[in-house]
Amino acid sequence: NVSIRTKSIISQIKPTEKGGFNLSVGGQMTHCQSLVVASGGLSIPTLGASGFGYDIAKQFGLGLLPRSAGLVPFTFSDWVKDICETNSGLSIDVEMSVNGVSFKENLLFTHRGISGPAALQLSSYWKSGQVISINLMPDQDARALLLRYKESNPKSLLRNLIAPLLSKGFTQSLQSRYWPQHAETPIAEIANETLENLASQLSNWKLKPSGTEGYRTAEVTLCGVNTDNISSKTMECKSQPGLYFIGEVLDVTGHLGGYNFQWAWASGYTAGCYV
């Protein structure tokens, strides 16, 4: 028989001398031989996420690694936010990098910052205060492209040449920031050194996020219960027989694409084979 209890709060968990656990559930005592903690992380609290699983880990003396939001949009509070807000809804293909890790995927501008697969993936490797790099032309050699435009389209304005690659609105935003003095200057009259500096901005756009959207919109919680304390064969706690941890509550985080769901299902199945 399987009893499913909804809207129930576990207020106390006590291991017994004969094995198993006594649980206080909604004011009633329940005994179980095996206890599987599948509480998830802190992400999206409006769906009921909480630190309950971490509290259980602390109770039984298990190591916890510092948690933070992962697979989450970046936010900005300076002029970058103005650019993002102006171009909110625009998506472009980029390559984003931080700490030696790069993702070549889609970037989406929002009214508060940047999102999309590239930004979400990178957020799991970013630390507060770090600068990120964005290659706005990942399939082009920006320097060679601008110098080639100078030869082939000498009378054209720089923004009109770049717009087909980055969109008219975003190119206008970049122009206002990086080459306002050459807004109406034919590219043939712009010095090669200036074009090379602009190419560096396009291929290595350095931005410093003010933060992220946090757990409110994060798809996962980074870190959690130290896996050194958990058997990779059974998901059972090494120091407390009968206690299992599975899914996101553990220090396991996957990339976008269903990997975190797969981890939850696989670790749950594994524990289910041994309880």
Q: What spans do the regions from the language model cover?
A:
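Short hydrophobic core segments
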Residues: 10, 29-49, 57-58, 107-112, ...
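Glycine-rich phosphate/pyrophosphate-binding beta-alpha loops
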Residues: 44-45, 73-74, 110, 114-117, ...
